[in-house]
Amino acid sequence: MRYAGSENFTGRPITGYDAPVCLLTRDAVAALGRVQAKFSEFGLGLKVFDCYRPARAVADFAAWARDPADQKRKADYYPNIDKSRLFELGYIAERSGHSRGSTIDVTLVDVRSGEELDMGGPYDLFDKRSWPRAPEVAPQARANRMLLQDVMVANGFRPLKEEWWHFTLSQEPHPDSYFDFLIR
């Protein structure tokens, strides 16, 4: 879980992530089991970057985004965007579906090598290249994104238009809730 450590767009652990643990609703876990079973037919697996996100973590993201002085990870995570536009462009929000427990950030890996498949850009890159159908992404990376999206959608998830890695269970059990318990 990226936000339990410092390898993320803030460069530090995020409030609410006391452990690198993935928490999800039972419905999301069941759907992910079906996704993983399908990918295993191709020698692929899922790598999880983020699952449930406490509301206090979302507030931490928002506070970071409002601090114009903190630019230490700009080159890695938002090289082409002025930090002041992260809310406007939809990369940071005041509330997150992750706080409902049925949203997950994932990529594909080759199970033999453990290597991530080329997705045309890294996780959490705030850039149009992260859009699932970004035209500037190489054909193989776009095909990998579409494979991930197609299997996730076929198993009950819906994608986010700005992030190739982000999926929410369509029939999530807590659509109007935003939880704030710690990840331990």
State each model region's role.
Residues 167:
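Conserved metal-phosphate-binding beta-hairpin within the catalytic cores
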